[in-house]
Amino acid sequence: MRFCLMVTGPAYGSQHASSAWLFARELLAQGHSVESVFFYREGVLNASELTAPASDEVDMTRNWQQLHQQHGVALNVCVAAALRRGVSDKQEAANLGLAAANLAEGFQLTGLGALAEAALSCDRLVQF
C-alpha cells in the first residue's frame, strides 16, 4: 500500500513526530511505500535545522532527513504554517527580508495543494 503521513506536532514536547517516524519505518519494513510526509501546524518545527538535542536524545530532524535520503520520502512543509513559526527557506527569507533561513536540508516548503495531492495519490493518509 502507498501511505502518506501528516505530522501536526513538534519534534519535541509531544509524541506526534516520533510516532509518525516510527510508523513510517515500520511501514517500510513491512514492504509498504511512504510517498510523503506533510508537516502542518506545529509539525513544521520538525523542519528547522536550528534544533540541537542533547547527545542522548533523539534528533527528529535528522531522522526525517535519513528517511528522505534512504527511501525517497518527500518531506513537505506547509509554507504558511512554517513562516508563522519562524521556519523559512532561502527564497522566502530573501522575499520577506528575513535575516536568515533555517529550513533543514531535504525538506521543502509547499502549499496545502501538496497535502491534497497526497490525499488523492495515496491509498491511506494518516495524521499524527
Curated annotation (Swiss-Prot):
The keyword tRNA processing applies. GO terms for biological process: tRNA wobble position uridine thiolation. Its EC number is 2.8.1.-. The active site is at 78 (cysteine persulfide intermediate). GO terms for cellular component: sulfurtransferase complex. Pfam families: DsrE (PF02635). NCBIfam families: PRK00207.1 (NF001237), sulf_tusD_dsrE (TIGR03012). Heterohexamer, formed by a dimer of trimers. The hexameric TusBCD complex contains 2 copies each of TusB, TusC and TusD. The TusBCD complex interacts with TusE. This is Sulfurtransferase TusD.
